Amino acid sequence: MIDSDGFRANVGIIICNRYGQVMWARRFGQHSWQFPQGGVDDGETAEEAMYRELYEEVGLRPEHVHILTSTRSWLRYRLPKRLVRQDSKPVCIGQKQKWFLLQLKSQDSAINLSSSGHPEFDDWRWVSYWYPVRQVVSFKRDVYRKVMKEFAVTALSFQTLEIPRKRGRQKTTG
């Protein structure tokens, strides 16, 4: 769904654990890391798209997570000119995103990057809350800063004071 301004409707997903860390995933075959995200299909609500993308990209189902909040409005970013496909109609110049903050209720082992036939990510880890703002590709940085600021009080209020154990995918960065 590309709107009349050339922005594709999209959902962004931030998954946090009980330590206030967020899931950070590496794009398949690349060196870039980001939060899960994906397009909203025709006839689909943003929440329906979020649950579909959540399963397709990280293998989690609704019972594995709890929605803590979502952004009050759609946030936009423009694609760099080199990434705009001029040969597709309508031309997509960027994304408009509705973001969701989810709390992981299940164990880390429920995360499965190979749940779909075409994995989006090939690795993931838990990182400190603000780490992604400094690390995401530059054209997404402003949106990440806005969404992380909007979600900060909610996300950080759910963290426990215990130190994360080093088990499984409990890697931390940042």
From Swiss-Prot:
Keywords of this entry: Hydrolase
UniProt-listed Pfam families: NUDIX (PF00293)
One of the protein's GO biological processes: mRNA catabolic process
Motif Nudix box: where in chain: 38-59
Annotated ranges, domain Nudix hydrolase: 6-149
Cofactors required: a divalent metal cation
Entry EC number(s): 3.6.1.-
Gene Ontology molecular function: mRNA 5'-diphosphatase activity
Any GO CC annotation of this UniProt entry: cytoplasm
Purpose: Accelerates the degradation of transcripts by removing pyrophosphate from the 5'-end of triphosphorylated RNA, leading to a more labile monophosphorylated state that can stimulate subsequent ribonuclease cleavage.
Family: Belongs to the Nudix hydrolase family. RppH subfamily.
Name by which UniProt lists this protein: RNA pyrophosphohydrolase
Organism: Shewanella baltica (strain OS155 / ATCC BAA-1091)
